[in-house]
């Protein structure tokens, strides 16, 4: 017998705010969403700050959003967890950090600290680097090198120079640490197997190959002079003595896993074959668990399990579910949605649609949305699934480029696809929910008119199609209990989210 699915459509990076010259959501032609808002119950959800387990006022992101949606509870995130440990002193007792630093003392080797140098809070926080530098000083380490990955996505595209300058000042004030390399996250933090990019980052950090400039602040200024902003800055070697070698210790201070895996695997995995390189042993600390299969690493902050999240709970009830997205957001509807667990539950099917191979997504704002849409509708029509979780990546990934017209096109593409998926779901007698994990495309311009590439703290929509009811405002953690509610199922006690349906 065909199943009538409950379909959750996540429009990644689609926030709500008033119309304006930089609002790609309001500038776009969105006949499908306009119709859904007019015809069905809808409300707004908080997707940032304390409501998703982040510090107050901190913008949400895809990892956090999907973890909260899938968990059906506010999941305390790595950023406040680590920051709190700095405040209470337990950070400096961390076993993995201590092992890395003690190995340097014992072997007379170097300590390398690398990660995203910004206060964006999505992948890392500069204050965590400063705490590691302080810890290295406390332990009497002298050979300490910082490899700075510039951001330009979660913060202003030209804020990198100030962060590099601040980092250099901090090293000088502490009397420990030198900036050895500087490069854009485009190279060091790829997540799409673009090994030619990762190799440039690797070659700079390990072999000292790349542009040479002893002044890291000037290196960033030179990049700006060439019209290359932080994210895309080519790797620059500032201190040729600061290369990574045998028996050195490395602490990768990013806590978000998805963009930390590739460069980590290149260094720690003897079987790595993404590009030619010699393998050598290091003491390597991943700030969090980047991948359960990663060999030869220590994990500083092991994951706190999210028990009985939506995926696990549906599976335990013998129900079927589909997760579908293109490459850029596949980890989010699987790994993050399942609470940071790679495990695929019984009854859970997954469909990965490759993202287009373009340098930046403003060049193809449609991305692979229509292919995701087509494959999803095929699966809906199969009648095989009780629940379908679907992500459209466009508003977020194109929003990050800062190109307004491309973001408008992205919104319009998502609008078309959402309309088709909702229609297919309702045709099967199912219920469709349309929401987002955080904002982005609704603010494409800074107040001064320059491009805005970061996420926002704006509310996100929630539309319930196919169930005549009244909804209350809520937060992302309330989505899973709402899904269970419309299916006539009680939420497990671990979920502290509440149904959005007004009883």
Identify the role of each PLM range.
Residues 1-503:
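Feature captures the catalytic ectodomains and active-site-proximal regions of enzymes
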